[in-house]
Each structure stands twice: as C-alpha cells, then as structure tokens.
Curated annotation (Swiss-Prot):
Localization in the cell: Secreted, Cell wall
Organism domain of life: Eukaryota
A GO term from the CC aspect: extracellular region
Signal peptide: 1-17
Function of the molecule: Constitutive protein of the cell wall.
Induction of the gene: Shows high expression in fruiting bodies and is highly expressed throughout development.
Alphabetical UniProt keywords: Cell wall, Glycoprotein, Secreted, Signal
Organism per entry: Armillaria ostoyae
Additional remarks: Armillaria species are both devastating forest pathogens and some of the largest and oldest terrestrial organisms on Earth. They forage for hosts and achieve immense colony sizes via rhizomorphs, root-like multicellular structures of clonal dispersal. An A.ostoyae colony, known as the 'humongous fungus' in the Malheur National Forest in the Strawberry Mountains of eastern Oregon, was found to be the largest fungal colony in the world, spanning an area of 9.1 square kilometers. This organism is estimated to be some 8,000 years old and may weigh as much as 35,000 tons.
Post-translation changes: Galactomannoprotein, glycosylated.
Name this protein carries in UniProt: Cell wall galactomannoprotein
UniProt record similarity statement: Belongs to the cell wall mannoprotein 1 family.
Glycan-carrying positions: N38, N173
Amino acid sequence: MFFRILALLPLVFLVTAHSLVSRSDVVVPVCNAISNMNTTAIALQNACTNFEAQPTNDMAMPIMKFGFALEGEISSGINVCPSDVLSSGDTEILFNALKDLYDTIQKLVSSILKLKDAIIAAGYEAQSCFAVEMMATSMTTFMDKVYACSANEYKGPLDEMRSGVLTMMAQANFSYCGTVSPRGSSKISGVEI
C-alpha cells in the first residue's frame, strides 16, 4: 500500500506543477496584441505630431488611418484575451506589457486633445468623434477583460492602470464628442468626468 502511494506522488507533483507554471500559449497572443497596439499608437502619435507641424487635409488623413487601425488592434486584443484567470507568472508578463502601452496611450491622448481645434478646422469633426468613440469603447472592453483574467495579486495595480486609461479615453471622448461614452452617459465603465 505504501509503495502504491509513492508511485502516485510523481503524478500528483506533475499535475500540481503544471497548474503553477505560466501558460505562455495563453499570454503570448495577448502580449502580441498589446505590442501591435503600442506600435500603432506610436504611429498615430507621430501622425498627430506631423499634423501639428503642418495642419492640412493631407496630414489629417494618416491620423484617421492610424486611429481606425488602432481600434482594430484593440479589437484583436479583445478577441485573444483569455476568459480564464491567468497564473501569477502570466499576469506579471501581461502587466509588464501593459505598462508600455499605458505610457504610449498617455502621450497619444495628450496629443489628440491638443489637436482638437486643428482637426475640427480641417473638417474632420464627425470622423474624429466616431474614431475616438470607437477607440474609447474598445479600450474600455479590453481593459475590463484584462482585469477580469488577471491573478488577484495584480488586481490593485491593474485597477489603477485601468482607471487611468479609461479616464484618458473618457477625456478624449468628452472633448471630441461632448459625452464621455458613446451612449451619451457621463461614465465609461465606472469612470466619471
């Protein structure tokens, strides 16, 4: 009887160890999506910088192009974000990837807010409102999904990051569209302006 129990120990160890190991097959697609969002957000920020230097219709077009591309990247991130709770190791990897995106989004929203009058003067008020609404809605959904799948020990820092991103998106949406959320309320996922 004793030897039968000993024979089962390696199996129990392997099953337990497997559940504790990071599942890179789950987190890599999300990190790739975050990397793509970051790259596209930087391209959008560069387009904003170019438009600021030369506010013409030709320079406004890349802003629209990269704005819609960023919304597409965010949607891809929503699609690959797992619904199961990640391990601590996977959540740490995800959190580190999100820190870079957070910094980029801060700079991007600052640029977008600064250019509002010039973009409206170029005749892109309706398109800008639509693009910002789509981005705010998608980013809210993405951050909510990331928060939901994260390990408990990262919930605090992720909630701060999520609130920061949602506040930035709400500010941009309010600036361009006059409402905080696409449905006209003064809230985006619990964040008020």
